[in-house]
């Protein structure tokens, strides 16, 4: 197991959104593992960025612990995991206490937030690779498409280049549920709506087989646990994040990706079924490689990525 690494904090002096709005002293929460190596100019040349999913933060790097530990594909890299723009810990409606006055943001804003942090904190303007899980994959793909010379390799995990169909509907439904709640409209925390929204996400995170294997009482208990966790979320964090996700569409841009790309998909993923997402995405990215595997954990099967360490070692090595 990965040793628990304490979070560190930094402030970006000024961050400007695509909209032109700006925030000052923008907080960034991050964690690092591994040792940095320096080139002849004294610049870190072995950085790999890990980007977490919708509900994660910088501690989510533990999901790829098997890759960062001794013997793992990333053991010789300096892995940096950042709590994304809009997520608690980094600049977000809740962390800044701006609430609804926090600027709405896009996936590109999330990418630029990471890029500016890397430059200001570490002097890094090019990384060895970017790994993104789920919504973190949205950022990784956008980064590679918008700034194709800034990374050597790209590993998108259980993700897509666009939000359509059931995923769009889920994000939209969650926002309607929260924004229509009487408590939210009255200016108080809509705990019930947040709880129900979290339960909804839980019911899509695992495979049908996983849910079928649970006793009804176990399923009810798991739903209640997720609901209790969800009730603690900030409504504007959720709404703003969902709005950013709903606008995610890299159609016509994937062809510009130059980084060597290795895509992972789970056959039982109910958010991003391979036939709708990872398979066509692999066909759109030049020379992309695709690995599909089975997991009863569905979307959360990404936690089993360590099983494919040797494939990743070979990929990073260019074999």
UniProtKB/Swiss-Prot annotation:
Question: Where does it sit, as one GO cellular component term?
Answer: cytoplasm
Localization of this protein: Cytoplasm
Q: Which residues form the active site?
A: 269
Q: Name one GO molecular function term.
A: homoserine O-acetyltransferase activity
The biological processes this protein is annotated with in GO are: homoserine metabolic process; methionine biosynthetic process
- InterPro entries, from UniProt? AB_hydrolase_1 (IPR000073), AB_hydrolase_fold (IPR029058), HAT_MetX-like (IPR008220)
According to the entry, every stretch annotated as the AB hydrolase-1 domain falls at 46-301
SUPFAM superfamilies with a match to the protein in the record: alpha/beta-Hydrolases
- Print the keywords alphabetically: Acyltransferase, Cytoplasm, Transferase
Enzyme Commission no: 2.3.1.-
First-listed, main subcellular location of the protein, grouped into a coarse class: cytoplasm
> Subunit comment for this entry?
Homodimer.
Q: Report what the protein is called.
A: Probable acyltransferase
- Species of origin: Methanothermobacter thermautotrophicus (strain ATCC 29096 / DSM 1053 / JCM 10044 / NBRC 100330 / Delta H)
Lineage of the species this protein comes from: Archaea, Methanobacteriati, Methanobacteriota, Methanomada group, Methanobacteria
């Amino acid at each position: 197991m990965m040793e628990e690494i304490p979070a560190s904090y930094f402030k970006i002096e000024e961050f400007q959104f695509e909209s032109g709005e700006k925030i000052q002293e923008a907080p960034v929460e991050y964690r690092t593992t591994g040792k940095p190596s320096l080139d002849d100019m004294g610049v870190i040349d072995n950085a790999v960025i890990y980007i977490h999913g919708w509900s994660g933060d910088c501690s989510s790097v533990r999901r790829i612990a098997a890759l960062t530990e001794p013997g793992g594909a990333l053991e010789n890299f300096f892995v940096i995991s950042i709590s994304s723009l809009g997520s608690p810990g980094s600049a977000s409606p809740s962390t800044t206490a701006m609430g609804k006055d926090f600027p709405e943001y896009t996936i590109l804003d999330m990418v630029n937030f990471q890029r500016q942090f890397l430059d200001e904190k570490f002097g890094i303007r090019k990384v060895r690779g970017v790994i993104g899980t789920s919504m973190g994959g949205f950022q990784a793909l956008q980064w590679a498409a918008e700034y194709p010379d800034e990374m050597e390799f790209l590993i998108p995990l259980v993700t897509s280049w666009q939000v359509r169909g059931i995923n769009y509907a889920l994000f939209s439904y969650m926002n309607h549920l929260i924004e229509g709640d009487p408590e939210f409209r009255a200016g108080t925390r809509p705990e019930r709506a947040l709880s129900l929204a979290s339960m909804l996400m839980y019911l899509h995170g695992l495979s049908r087989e996983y849910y079928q294997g649970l006793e009804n009482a176990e399923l009810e208990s798991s739903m209640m646990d997720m609901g209790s966790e969800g009730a603690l979320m900030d409504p504007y964090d959720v709404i703003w994040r969902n709005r950013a996700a709903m606008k995610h569409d890299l159609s016509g841009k994937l062809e510009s990706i130059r980084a060597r790309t290795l895509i992972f998909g789970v056959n039982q993923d109910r958010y991003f079924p391979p036939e709708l997402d990872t398979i066509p995405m692999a066909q759109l990215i030049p020379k992309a490689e695709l690995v599909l595997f089975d997991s009863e954990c569905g979307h959360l099967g990404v936690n089993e990525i360590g099983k494919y360490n040797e494939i990743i070692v070979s990929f990073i090595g260019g074999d």
